[in-house]
């Protein structure tokens, strides 16, 4: 295991390095034995690393250090052409960070202790004073040209929380582009401003799920979402609201959604708690076609095509 406690503004490089954990040598279930752990610091570049078979995460970014009016978030971290494979809890976790870029990385074969995601962006629970300072956040995270495959949980999990007392989200600005989810999917909630563009999502269950905590400003654009199970009862994209969680400005556009036995898109909204747009999508072989009158008046629905 490598722990990085780096301070200052100079650049720190780690490259062409392999870490093999002892997951196969122990039956003990654990979550904290990480291959690489970045607790502090900024301007860090990880390049061409492999971190696998760890009894925690392949890469962990975050800390629990709190101090009034000082931000101790790890920041400006670039992870380039790295492979996180066969780890026990996650391929990679981010619990606190600002400006993290993943480029050309692989998150594969995570299996052991839930959530078992390829990449999990999930702030830890902290006391209310820390929420008010907004310094315990996950913000400005970019995922480009990455590959997620055969993880026991989600390919990508973005698990935010309720707004703080100032009405702000602590998960903000998540961007996913040109990435492939092979036998994987995306679960995202409790956040503001997430964009997923030009991605292929091949799943054996649902493709996308938003629920649990209120979510704002989500764009799913130019994505191919396909269920690989021939006979199934799944939904391609599901957004679910209750009296306690409403979702605003959810936009699904220019996507092709294929072979979901129940719905291509299902907005489970009995309280008019979802607003957004569903436009210019193509549905292939989906069990039930969504009609405009199935949706709340806050949803713009037009120019979608159904090919049965």
What feature does the model see in each segment?
Residues 2-3, 23-27, 34, 55-61, ...:
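Short glycine/acidic-rich loop motifs that flank beta-strands on beta-rich extracellular proteins
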Residues 1-13, 22-43, 58-70, 94, ...:
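Extracellular beta-strand-rich solenoid/capping regions of secreted or surface-exposed proteins
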Residues 11-18, 42-53, 72-90, 98-111, ...:
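Right-handed parallel beta-helix
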């Amino acid at each position: 295991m490598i722990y990085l406690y780096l301070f200052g503004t100079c650049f720190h490089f780690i490259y062409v390095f392999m870490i093999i954990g002892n997951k196969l040598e122990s039956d003990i279930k654990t979550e904290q034995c990480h291959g690489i752990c970045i607790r502090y610091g900024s301007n860090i570049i990880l390049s061409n690393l492999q971190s696998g078979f760890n009894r925690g995460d392949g890469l962990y970014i975050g800390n629990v250090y709190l101090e009034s009016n000082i931000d101790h978030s790890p920041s400006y971290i670039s992870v380039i052409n790295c492979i996180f494979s066969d780890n026990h809890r996650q391929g990679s976790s981010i619990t606190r960070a600002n400006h993290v870029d993943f480029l050309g990385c692989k998150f594969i074969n995570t299996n052991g202790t839930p959530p078992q995601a390829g990449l999990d962006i999930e702030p830890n629970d902290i006391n209310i004073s820390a929420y008010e300072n907004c310094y315990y956040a996950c913000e400005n995270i970019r995922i480009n040209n990455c590959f997620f495959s055969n993880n026991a949980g989600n390919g990508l999990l973005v698990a935010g929380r309720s707004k703080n007392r100032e009405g702000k989200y602590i998960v903000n600005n998540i961007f996913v582009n040109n990435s492939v989810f092979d036998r994987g999917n995306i679960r995202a909630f409790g956040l503001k401003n997430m964009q997923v563009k030009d991605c292929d999502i091949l799943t054996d269950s649902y493709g996308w799920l938003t629920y649990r905590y209120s979510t704002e400003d989500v764009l799913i654009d130019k994505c191919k979402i396909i269920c690989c199970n021939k006979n199934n009862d799944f939904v391609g994209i599901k957004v679910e609201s209750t009296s306690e969680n409403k979702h605003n400005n959810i936009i699904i556009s220019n996507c092709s959604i294929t072979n979901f036995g129940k719905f291509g898109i299902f907005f489970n909204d009995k309280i008019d708690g979802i607003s957004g747009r569903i436009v210019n999508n193509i549905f292939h072989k989906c069990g039930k076609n969504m009609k405009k009158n199935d949706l709340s008046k806050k949803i713009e629905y037009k120019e979608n095509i159904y090919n049965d």
